[in-house]
């Protein structure tokens, strides 16, 4: 028996050699790819033998996705060739890739196909009798019950006990299995189980699997308009960059991934009925996206009362990965989700620690009071809306300790800290990581450029150097900011948070050994003109301790 996973999706199976050659050229699989998978049972006419499928298992990252012992569940027989079977069209979307076990941040994902087949007499046509009736189950019959694919359904205590004993015996017998490697191309392995039956064989195929897109759905309610704005955002992932460098353009450094989108669908569903919604701003499809591109489409929904169930939507993205003009891999991603709204955060002041520091050090209503406050350290630590003010970050240290309690000897420093670029131009900053500790570092760099809620009027007055003695005595109330002032502050600090984008987001740094130094080149692009005395939100995550550290305080960027 042979299994073909050809790169070309237009093959109809009329030429076995074309299937084989296209299969040999495949080096990877895309998550949600519409695979053109074939099984060819080539019999032995001299010995009057033929092969039948006994079991099929598909695993992603060692997690079992699906399993079946009946070939009719997933395959259809080709009319003109009774020995050739083709994977059903809906199996990839409904069964094979109905999971989230593939990570798109650069993790080494693997998919494995395991086929167990048996050689039988060609005159013996009762294929069903060869299979264990207790072991015949499929996910199609129970997909509506949302059974976890890595677990086997229990139908009765008697059948479960019988199956358990059989699995135990099979496990003991597999320890004595003799493996015969027929071919190692494309990670193919053929095995013969001579301990139980010399006519039982196993075929294994393993490929790296990549998820090309990062996707998210953001929802916000506008009570004044009685509606919900639902934003569908997606962009190319870190794994797509690895795929491009390793398999698509291994010899070229400046080549980009190319995705051709044919469908971007957002459907409102209710039971069996569904209706497709159009985005507020028209999105022309088909469209083409390249590496580092980001696409957003916003949809408008009716705001429902709190007592009712939230909206449920189905999102579908259909696109093709273009390897070259005559070879494209079809990918179809589809999922259902509820349109949930986050609880609105009230306008609150910053921590009492900052307020107490300001009240103790500020004793003048003039600008000198603010200067004294900066020198005493009160305003140097003040954050407005979660964003460090560049006015007081110019003198920030360029080196920062990762985890003072555990890894106090880890330092970060930007080598080229003073950058001057033109708006829209990409630039690179080199981050030096000095690991003087005795432990290796497993780090990820990411940029979280979000703006938190605006602080209260008390902290804004403190930041402007206004005397707080009257506030301590209760003569001046701590009134909240007006909507106009909040909007002005939002525009003021939006540039700090959103003016620079990290192109190499979720950058996985190779493990830094103890007492070693590593240089990481971080790629940015500036989309808003201005001076940035800090990159607030640029952080490093230690995967071993789950600790975060901000490393953007030592940066200084001027975008013209």
UniProtKB/Swiss-Prot annotation:
Residues bearing the modification Phosphoserine = 393, 398
The cellular component terms of Gene Ontology attached to this UniProt record, alphabetical and capped at eight, are: cytosol; trans-Golgi network; TRAPPII protein complex
Localisation:
Cytoplasm; Golgi apparatus, cis-Golgi network
Q: Which residues form the signal peptide?
A: none
Q: Which InterPro entries match?
A: IgD1_Trs65, IgD2_Trs65, IgD3_Trs65, Trs65
Where is the stretch described as Disordered?
164-193
Entry superkingdom: Eukaryota
Record pathway: Glycan metabolism; beta-glucan biosynthesis
Question: Which BP terms does GO give this entry?
Answer: beta-glucan biosynthetic process; cell wall organization; intra-Golgi vesicle-mediated transport; protein-containing complex assembly; retrograde transport, endosome to Golgi
Keywords assigned by UniProt, alphabetized: Cell wall biogenesis/degradation, Cytoplasm, Golgi apparatus, Phosphoprotein, Transport
The role this protein plays is: Specific subunit of the TRAPP II complex, a highly conserved vesicle tethering complex that functions in the late Golgi as a guanine nucleotide exchanger (GEF) for the Golgi YPT1 GTPase. TRS65 plays a role in the YPT GEF activity of TRAPP II in concert with the two other TRAPP II-specific subunits TRS120 and TRS130. Involved in cell wall (1-->6)-beta-glucan synthesis.
Quaternary structure and partners: Part of the multisubunit TRAPP (transport protein particle) II complex composed of BET3, BET5, TRS20, TRS23, TRS31, TRS33, TRS65, TRS120 and TRS130. Interacts directly with TRS120 and TRS130.
What more the UniProt record tells us is: Present with 1660 molecules/cell in log phase SD medium.
The molecule here is called: Trafficking protein particle complex II-specific subunit 65
């Amino acid at each position: 028996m042979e299994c073909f996973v050809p790169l070309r999706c237009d093959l109809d199976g009329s030429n076995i050699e074309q299937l084989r050659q296209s299969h040999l050229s495949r080096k990877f699989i895309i998550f949600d790819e519409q695979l053109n998978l074939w099984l060819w049972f080539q019999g032995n006419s001299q010995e009057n033998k033929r092969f039948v499928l006994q079991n099929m298992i598909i695993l992603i990252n060692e997690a079992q996705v699906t399993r079946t012992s009946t070939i009719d569940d997933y395959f259809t027989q080709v009319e003109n060739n009774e020995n050739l079977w083709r994977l059903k069209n809906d199996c990839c979307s409904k069964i094979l890739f109905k999971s989230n076990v593939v990570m798109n941040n650069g993790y080494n994902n693997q998919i494995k196909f395991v086929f167990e087949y048996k050689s039988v007499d060609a005159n013996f046509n009762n294929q069903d009798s060869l299979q264990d009736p207790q072991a015949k189950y499929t996910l199609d019959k129970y997909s509506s019950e949302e059974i976890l694919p890595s677990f086997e359904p229990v139908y009765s205590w008697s059948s479960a006990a019988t199956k358990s004993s059989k699995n135990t015996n099979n496990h003991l017998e597999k320890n004595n299995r003799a493996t015969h490697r027929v071919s190692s191309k494309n990670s193919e392995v053929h095995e013969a189980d001579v301990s139980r039956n010399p006519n039982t064989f196993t075929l294994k195929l393993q490929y790296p699997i990549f998820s090309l897109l990062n996707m998210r759905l953001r929802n916000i309610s506008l009570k004044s308009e009685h509606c919900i704005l639902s934003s569908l955002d997606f962009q190319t992932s870190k794994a797509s960059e690895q795929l491009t460098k390793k398999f698509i353009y291994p010899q070229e450094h400046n080549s980009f991934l190319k995705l051709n989108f044919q469908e971007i669908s957002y459907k409102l569903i209710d039971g069996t009925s569904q209706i497709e919604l159009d985005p507020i701003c028209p999105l022309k499809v088909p469209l083409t996206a390249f590496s580092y591109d980001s696409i957003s489409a916003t949809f408008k929904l009716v705001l429902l009362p709190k007592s009712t169930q939230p909206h449920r939507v189905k999102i579908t993205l259909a696109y093709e990965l273009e390897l070259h003009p005559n070879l494209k891999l079809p990918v179809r991603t589809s999922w259902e989700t509820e349109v949930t709204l986050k609880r609105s955060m009230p306008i609150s002041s910053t921590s009492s620690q900052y307020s107490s520091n300001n009240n103790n050090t500020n004793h003048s209503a003039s600008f000198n009071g603010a200067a004294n406050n900066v020198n005493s350290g009160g305003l140097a630590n003040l954050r407005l809306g979660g964003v460090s003010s560049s006015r007081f970050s110019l003198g920030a240290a360029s080196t920062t300790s990762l985890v003072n309690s555990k890894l106090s000897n880890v330092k970060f420093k930007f080598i080229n800290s003073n950058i001057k670029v033109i708006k829209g131009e990409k630039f690179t900053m080199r981050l030096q990581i000095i690991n003087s500790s005795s432990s290796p570092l497993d780090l990820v760099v990411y940029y979280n450029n979000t703006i938190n809620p605006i602080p209260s009027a008390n902290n804004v007055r403190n930041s402007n150097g206004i005397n707080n003695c009257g506030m301590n005595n209760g003569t001046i109330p701590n009134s909240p900011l007006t909507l106009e002032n909040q909007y002005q502050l939002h525009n003021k600090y939006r540039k700090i948070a959103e003016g620079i984008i990290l192109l190499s987001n979720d950058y996985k740094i190779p493990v830094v050994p103890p007492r070693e130094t590593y240089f990481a080149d971080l790629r940015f692009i500036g989309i808003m003109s201005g001076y940035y005395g800090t990159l607030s939100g640029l952080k490093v995550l230690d995967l071993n301790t789950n600790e975060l550290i901000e490393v953007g305080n030592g940066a200084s960027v001027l975008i013209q």
